[in-house]
């Protein structure tokens, strides 16, 4: 009975006590640091979107120079590479046209992308490939930043604005001297039309990216990729026979360019669509300016077209701006829980 008295309920000092762990020192073995979503999106846009798309413009110009391949016919060949995605959607049991509640927006996204690509392919046939890509990417970056501010109230940091300003300045340095040809009669008129088409292509691209960010349903990416091919064929096939003359490529070089354009454009489409869901659309478009640098290199080494010193200086400014944007967004997310 005496042992049950509270004064006798003392700890047994004869037994060793368990080792104590400081409560203030968390364990370092239960969390990892991985790249953030914005970092992943920007790297995908840089490596998969910008670099692959940089080959599309010069290859399109090569196909036009060797076989006089019309822009709408090139768009048809590109859309054909998107149609096999229907097999993936059927295999997964998803509707080909997307859920009924978002079907209109998905079709609008496809129409804007087809318009953007059609304008881009038409522009590279009348102006140098590097300049056409420059104007298109510059307008898409500026329009994406303005649309994000107006529609989403999504601001940017000071470093991001610095990178956007630098990349746009680099594009102006590249394309500015070429605007002097606008005063050379009929040639200048076609040149002006090419720059206008490139600008409209960038505007349509920025609108399409904003619409894609509002689509949230399973298999969104393969659905919009398939719709791009479907809508592109519906628009370009009648337009080819009404506005242009169909040409069947006869040489191996033309067919190689057509296949390369289709595959590289599909890779770029998928990567850009993924990246814009992870990072700010204006930053994604700014990183895609790497396409301009690749196009200028191919313009000089493959197409043997003149690259002015202003092109080289502008390309350097663009690369520096991309480095600023990428470095500012290099952050990591901690994975896992920290134990106390």
From Swiss-Prot:
Domain EamA: 51-176, 274-327
Compartments (UniProt record): Membrane
Keywords: Membrane, Repeat, Transmembrane, Transmembrane helix
Family of the protein in this entry: Belongs to the SLC35G solute transporter family.
SUPFAM superfamilies: Multidrug resistance efflux transporter EmrE
Region annotation (Disordered) ranges: 11-33
Disulfide bonds: none
Gene: Slc35g3
InterPro entries: EamA_dom
A Gene Ontology term for the protein's cellular component: membrane
Topology versus the membrane: Multi-pass membrane protein
Protein's name according to its UniProt entry: Solute carrier family 35 member G3
Pfam families: EamA (PF00892)
Transmembrane segments: 39-59, 69-89, 107-127, 160-180, 189-209, 223-243, 257-277, 283-303, 307-327
Signal peptide segment: none
Species per Swiss-Prot/TrEMBL record: Mus musculus (Mouse)
């Amino acid at each position: 009975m005496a042992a049950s008295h509270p004064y006798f309920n003392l700890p047994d000092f004869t037994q060793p006590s368990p080792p104590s762990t400081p409560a203030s020192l968390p364990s370092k073995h239960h969390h990892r640091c991985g790249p953030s979503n914005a970092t992943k999106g920007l790297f995908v846009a840089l490596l998969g979107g910008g670099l692959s798309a940089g080959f599309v413009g010069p290859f399109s110009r090569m196909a036009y120079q060797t076989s006089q391949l019309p822009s709408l016919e090139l768009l048809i060949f590109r859309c054909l590479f998107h149609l096999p995605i229907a097999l993936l959607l059927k295999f997964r049991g998803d509707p080909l046209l997307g859920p009924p509640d978002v079907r209109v927006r998905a079709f609008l996204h496809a129409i804007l992308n087809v318009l953007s690509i059609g304008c881009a392919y038409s522009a590279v046939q009348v102006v140098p490939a590097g300049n056409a890509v420059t104007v298109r990417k510059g307008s898409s970056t500026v329009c994406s930043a303005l649309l994000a501010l107006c529609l989403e109230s999504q601001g940017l940091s000071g470093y991001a604005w610095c990178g956007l300003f630098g990349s746009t300045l680099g594009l102006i340095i590249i394309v500015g001297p070429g605007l002097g040809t606008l005063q050379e009669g009929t040639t200048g008129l076609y040149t002006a039309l090419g720059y206008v088409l490139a600008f409209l292509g960038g505007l349509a691209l920025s609108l399409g990216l904003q619409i894609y960010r509002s689509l949230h349903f399973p298999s969104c990416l393969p659905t919009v990729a398939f719709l791009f091919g479907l809508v592109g064929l519906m628009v370009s096939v009648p337009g080819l026979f009404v506005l242009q003359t169909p040409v069947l490529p006869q040489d191996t070089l033309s067919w190689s360019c057509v296949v390369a354009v289709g595959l590289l454009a599909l890779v770029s489409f998928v990567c850009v669509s993924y990246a814009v869901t992870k990072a700010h659309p204006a930053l994604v478009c700014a990183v895609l300016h790497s396409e301009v640098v690749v196009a200028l290199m191919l313009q000089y080494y493959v197409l043997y077209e003149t690259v002015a010193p202003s092109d080289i200086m502008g390309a350097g400014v663009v690369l520096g701006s991309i480095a600023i944007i990428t470095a500012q967004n290099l952050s990591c997310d901690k994975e896992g829980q920290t134990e106390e």
